[in-house]
């Protein structure tokens, strides 16, 4: 468990003009380092701690007392949405910004419904993260333009996930397995990607087929590929 923090165990008393404290949670050290370099250059912001997975993040959260969290959606073990839901049980109003590699709007919808205050793509983090952090610290919701446009288009056309009840019925982990199937990943590769056992992945696949009324693994793959294509071109 790799965690770092820069705080005392007692919550710091806010001072006039004090820098806003940010906890970065990402399983890639280079991403954490890059965000820290970017954030620590700002006169009003400072990274107070880092973690690479959910358990470590909760430990640092308890000791570092951040003003905002930046969380990667695709953490090893419990993912970013699982961590977000856990955080909301103890810190219902703490601002959380989700970083994601997924540009499918369903992930943004689920993150916001789970209590996220913002959602941006990792590839635009350098450009958008400072704006996003300041927006959510001011009480706003921030979603990157690309994702916002997709969500609006889905809402207007009625093709969005809110009206696609079968896909919407999938759990967060089932959706992740479904997406990886659509990208051509086999069961063993999915298990490795998500740090799950093959038996667990097979169980998720069975649940997905049941929820989507699919009779075979072939139908599951075809449906997943089609869904991925639709989301990418939306």
Language-model features: locations:
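Basic, Lys/Arg-enriched C-terminal extension of HTH/homeodomain DNA-binding domains
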Residues: 2-9, 56, 152, 206-234
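Regulatory hinge/linker segments at domain boundaries
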Residues: 16-18, 152-180, 231-234
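The feature encodes the CheY-like receiver
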Residues: 31, 76
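Acidic catalytic/metal-coordinating carboxylates
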Residues: 53-56, 79-82
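Active-site residues of response regulator receiver
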Residues: 72, 100
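C-terminal output helix
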Residues: 106, 124-137, 141, 145-151
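Recognition helix of helix-turn-helix DNA-binding domains
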Residues: 184-219
